[in-house]
Every structure is written in C-alpha cells, then in structure tokens.
Regions:
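Conserved alpha/beta core of the MobA/IspD/sugar-nucleotide pyrophosphorylase nucleotidyltransferase superfamily
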Residues: 141, 147-192
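Nucleotide and nucleotide-moiety/phosphate-recognizing core
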Residues: 2-129, 137, 161-167
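Short, well-ordered coil↔helix boundary/capping segments
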Residues: 134-137, 146
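A general boundary/transition motif marking the beginning of the first structured unit of a protein
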Residues: 39, 143-144
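Short glycine- and hydrophobic/aromatic-rich loop-to-beta-strand nucleating segment
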Residues: 131-135, 174-176
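A short local structural element in Rossmann-fold oxidoreductases
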Residues: 11, 52, 144-145, 186
Length: 192
C-alpha cells in the first residue's frame, strides 16, 4: 500500500481523513486483509508516525520512505525492498482509494496466471484503467528501476502482452486528491 504521498493538493494528509469513523488508509488496508493477502506492506512518508498509528492493531509491515517527495516510484521501490524473495506477485494499492474493497483484490488475484501471459492484472471500468494493479515477480526488477511519479504507464507500454484487463466497478478509478473528493465520496457510497 503506497501511503507516502505529500497530499499537496489536499493540504492536510488525506490518508488520515476520517471516513466513516476510520482513517482513509485503514479502509484500504482492511480491505486487503479481508481479501486474505498474505503480507501487507505499507510504505509511509509524510506524517509517518500518524499513518502507522492509524493502522495500529492491523497485521501490517510499515516501512518509511525518506525520499517520498521524489515521486511514487521511490515508494514502490521501498516497498519492493521488503517483499519476500519467494513472493509470486505484489498487489500495488494506493492508500487514497477507500472504495476499493476485497472483491477488487480477489478478482485481480483470480485473473492472475503468468503461465498464460497474465502477469499484470489491471482493473478497468468503462475502458479506463485504474488501481490497484497485480504484478508478477518477474516484473519486480523493472518496477524497482522506475523513476519519478509516472507510476506504471511505461511498464504497461513495455509489457503490453503480459497485461490482462479485469472489468470492475468504478471504485478502481476513484481516489481522493482534494477536499471536494471527500464530499463526493460521502455522496457516492460509504466505504466498508
């Protein structure tokens, strides 16, 4: 779970925003826990101590990314550093997507089959790609070499034959960037 952003458009740390009585990042992590993800790694940055406190009691490994201000790729790299070597895959989730539930993770995992050239599982809604994305271990080195804040775009371009798009609901497109997104979230549907 990438939870190290600067929240520059929001001002305050959006990951700590109260959503139904819980911090936003806790919703994301709890959904992964319900999906029976083997190990959940949370990469922190800004307000690291507060993010860790928001996750207290959940079985997660928290690692701090001191370079979080240099882009998402630094957090991705930091998270990959602690993934066990025998892992088959990682599900890269963004901490600011509180509507992504365990069904999303479960559907992506069900679609995963590197032997059948489905080593990158991407959720889509109405033709638009979203998050989280499931990546096979064979992509870890390339992921760790990414730079800046471009996310997966370049990796998608160089690995297009390995991608399977998994149709899902609009939760995979909704993230919180500004205060108005919190208002919109309350109108859409409460996260679990």
């Amino acid at each position: 779970v990438l939870a190290a952003g600067t929240s520059s458009r929001m001002g305050s740390n959006k990951l700590l925003a109260d959503i139904g009585g819980k911090p936003m990042v806790r919703h994301t992590v709890a959904a992964l826990q319900r999906a029976s993800i083997d190990q959940i790694v949370v990469v922190t940055g800004r307000d690291s101590d507060h993010v860790i406190a928001a996750l207290q009691g959940l079985p997660v490994i928290c690692v701090h990314n001191p370079e979080f201000a240099h882009g998402l790729s630094t957090s991705l790299r930091r998270g990959l550093e602690v993934v066990p070597e025998d892992s088959d895959a990682v599900l890269v989730c963004l901490g600011d997507m509180p509507l992504v539930d365990e069904a999303v993770a479960s559907r992506l995992i069900a679609a995963f089959s590197p032997a059948e050239h489905r080593s990158i599982c991407v959720p889509v809604h109405q033709g638009m790609r979203g998050n989280p994305v499931l990546w096979a271990a064979r992509h870890f080195a390339e992921m760790a070499a990414a730079t800046g804040d471009v996310g997966a775009r370049r990796l998608f371009e160089t690995n297009s034959s390995a991608i399977v798009e998994v149709p899902l609901d609009d939760a995979v497109l909704f993230d919180v960037d500004v205060e108005a997104d919190l208002d919109r979230l309350a109108r859409l549907r409460p996260p679990r």
